[in-house]
């Protein structure tokens, strides 16, 4: 029997888990299962998190020792932004996850969710001098949201890096961690997930284009107009605030094909 199949629902063992927290756990567990399907895992590395609704300094994170495909709503660990583990975590948590996520939640009360990946495409572009280039529509719609953070070594070895990560993310929602990977931060789990999907696609397109002949750049007018559209994407007045339409579709797909996350 898998580790995830042995997990008892937290609703049965912890009466302090509110309905709002349970829904947040379902969202985050779904993100992990979907991430596994998209190949976003890196052994036991990479981590997604979601702020506990109604709190200022608590968030949910994956426990150390489970693959993305094994994560369930009940297996998620509750943390606070000071690095304290507030729920059971038999194997602990990924220290780098606490450094990266905790610092952003402490500095950005508007952020509800954070995702961090080491994908080949994202890490590859993070190692390029010019970073993500304005050479595809996928990249252009993200440009106004992107920031960069210089590589300092493993995040788990530098607790004070959390402040510099938050500083470099600033008011952005996409952070390229140089020579390391990518990070997205959004107002909902859906927005954070969909932004990461768009970052991944933009990076894949860039690497594919660079592998061929000379890269063609759009006109400056086309660049400016597309960036303006992207800056408003998923805003409160958009067709899909917080990427709600996309996320609902992802959740329906997972409920059909892999409902085991919801325990």
Region locations from a protein language model:
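Glycine-rich flexible loops
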Residues: 1-263
């Amino acid at each position: 029997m898998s580790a995830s199949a042995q997990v008892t629902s937290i609703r049965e063992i912890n009466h302090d888990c509110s309905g709002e927290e349970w829904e947040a756990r379902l969202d985050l567990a779904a993100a992990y299962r979907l991430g596994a399907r998209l190949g976003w895992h890196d052994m036991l590395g990479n981590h997604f998190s979601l702020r506990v609704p109604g709190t200022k300094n608590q968030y949910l994170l994956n426990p150390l020792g489970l693959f993305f495909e094994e994560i369930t709503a009940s297996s998620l660990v509750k943390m606070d932004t000071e690095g304290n583990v507030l729920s059971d975590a038999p194997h602990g948590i990924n220290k780098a996850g606490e450094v990266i996520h905790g610092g952003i939640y402490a500095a950005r009360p508007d952020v509800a969710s954070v995702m961090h990946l080491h994908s080949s495409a994202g890490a590859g572009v993070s190692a390029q001098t010019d970073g993500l280039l304005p050479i595809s529509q996928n990249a252009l719609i993200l440009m106004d949201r992107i920031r960069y953070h210089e590589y300092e070594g493993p995040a788990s070895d530098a607790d004070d890096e959390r402040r510099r990560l938050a500083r470099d993310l600033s008011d952005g929602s996409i952070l390229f961690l140089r020579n390391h990977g990518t990070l997205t931060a959004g107002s909902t789990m859906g927005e954070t997930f969909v932004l990461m999907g768009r970052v991944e696609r933009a990076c894949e397109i860039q690497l594919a284009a660079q592998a061929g002949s000379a890269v063609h750049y759009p006109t400056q007018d086309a660049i400016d107009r597309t960036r303006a559209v992207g800056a408003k994407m998923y805003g409160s007045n958009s067709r899909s605030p917080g990427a709600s339409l996309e996320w609902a579709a992802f959740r329906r797909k997972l409920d059909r094909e892999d409902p085991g996350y919801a325990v």
